[in-house]
């Protein structure tokens, strides 16, 4: 892939779905190929995924959340995935939307 010649300190990416076993899934095979290559060439992987990704399904596996440096999400995942993140030393950052901040 074209991006195989690139190296990055940080990769900020999202995914189509996160399975209960931590598998990160994507819908498009071409996008999956680019993300997998960049993950392999990045020192830190910052993953952004809202709560809908925990129940979504997609066809192409791009890796496992255990590879991530941090997961930024609006809601914490279920206990099995939380345990995997903890044991893999992935920092989980729960963020709120701007609407919630304005309402409070």
Task: List the predicted regions and their residue ranges.
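Conserved phosphate- and dinucleotide-binding cores of soluble alpha/beta proteins
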Residues: 1-104
């Amino acid at each position: 892939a074209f991006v195989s010649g690139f190296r990055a300190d940080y990769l900020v990416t999202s995914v189509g779905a996160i399975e209960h076993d931590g598998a990160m899934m994507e819908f498009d095979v071409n996008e999956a190929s680019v993300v997998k290559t960049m993950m392999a060439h990045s020192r830190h992987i910052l993953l952004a995924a809202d709560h809908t990704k925990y129940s979504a399904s997609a066809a192409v596996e791009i890796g496992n959340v255990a590879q991530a440096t941090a997961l930024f999400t609006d809601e914490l995942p279920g206990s099995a995935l939380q345990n995997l993140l903890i044991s893999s030393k992935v920092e989980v950052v729960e963020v709120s939307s701007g609407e919630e901040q304005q309402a409070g």
